[in-house]
Design a protein with these regions (language model features):
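Terminus-proximal functional modules
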Residues: 1-75
Length: 75
């Protein structure tokens, strides 16, 4: 399980709160077993689509809490 601080940072970034500023064309996430990215276009459109960096599988979430409950946080 990820720290409460990292989960809050992830939630705040996805909900447009806090001081998060994307520095690239993608936002990077991690889980216990995978790494994924969200395109900047999806982030700006509030679409929670993560693409697994090793398999190419796309994970879609409806809320930040759903994404967090699946074990994903900012990398």
């Amino acid at each position: 399980m990820w720290s409460n601080e990292l989960q809050k940072k992830t939630r705040d970034a996805l909900e447009g709160k806090g001081e998060f500023v994307p520095l690239a064309d993608a936002i990077y996430f991690k889980s216990d077993s995978s790494f994924a990215e969200m395109s900047l276009a999806d982030y700006l459109a509030n679409k929670l689509h993560l693409t697994d960096r090793s398999t190419g599988e796309i994970y879609t979430f409806h809320t930040a809490d759903e994404l967090l409950n699946a074990g994903w946080v900012l990398d």
